[in-house]
């Protein structure tokens, strides 16, 4: 390390200051995989990835499975780290110990804090986060931001005032401005549930409530939609779509589909078949049948297997195991969804560099001068006279 770098690092007041390649922020980050491959891809852009530290927001209308998806991530974190603790800030009071157990979360490892206002959430959260040391395993779960009033809104109601609260968005921004640095410096994932609403425009948009604060602070924002899964006229469940509104790892506006059925819960294989079809590693040799294809890396040829499968028979490790172990399939997923470095064209860069460094030259006017307006008028008169003569 150069003397200048050493002196600058030594002069810093932060204990975490280090050369970027040796920084804990980039080299000591937890990656927590869930039991749902499509969720892992939505979180990181690759099958082997998953949830990392930072603020993750799940937003959507009522009954869009937001809390369930959030608890699925909490369960995965606590399963990976048996000594982990969950800080649960509760404003909806709909999650019971029995419900937590059904989602794979041990209630004895959950610290439950009922909150009634944004100000209370801000004070409690910053005090608890400040007490955590980096390396201690903690996951934060907020259910929900959309249901939290500001202190002023509550006071206005008690004083029988009916004016609109113009401070809520400002308070929300203050909350995340204070707590977000803790998530990165202490390697803590925070999963927050939020609501959405439709804008009042000719072509309405689905946007997240709470102002700009949550969106600015979040590493990932999923806006969740859903559609019915039916067998004839019988409703069997719902297909939820994770719309990537913001992400630091995945291409924005990507969509990831996850099926939840009444008789089996979350389908861990949901979304994979359509994705593999789109990427070209699964084909339909005939209607209703599917076959895998593998890339021969020596010839670049896609080799199709002889066996064909029905769609319902593909939901198994027998079908997906060979594809998950196939590196070109993993690489194709990363190319399709993961944010990568900006590609550069060396030839174009060299041309632009040459233009920038070229010498200034004095402009030389062309030898043949353009005609004046008077000359053009004379030409037009002559042309008109010739036309009259020909007639």
From Swiss-Prot:
Biased composition annotated in UniProt, kind: Basic and acidic residues: 364-374
Residue numbers spanned by region Disordered: 364-391
Pfam family, one: T4_UVSX_C
Compositionally biased residues, Acidic residues: 376-391
One GO term (biological process): DNA repair
Keywords annotated in UniProt: ATP-binding, DNA damage, DNA recombination, DNA repair, DNA replication, Nucleotide-binding
An MF annotation (GO) of this entry: ATP-dependent DNA damage sensor activity
Highest taxon in the source lineage: Viruses
Family matches, as SUPFAM superfamilies: P-loop containing nucleoside triphosphate hydrolases
InterPro entries reported for this sequence: DNA_recomb/repair_RecA (IPR013765), P-loop_NTPase (IPR027417), RecA-like_N (IPR049428), RecA_ATP-bd (IPR020588), RecA_monomer-monomer_interface (IPR020587), T4_UVSX-like_C (IPR049047)
Sequence positions that bind ATP: 60-67
Similarity comment: Belongs to the RecA family.
Role noted for this protein: Important in genetic recombination, DNA repair, and replication. Possesses pairing and strand-transfer activity. Interacts with dda and gene 32 proteins.
Protein name: Recombination and repair protein
Taxonomic source organism: Enterobacteria phage T4
Encoding gene (name): UVSX
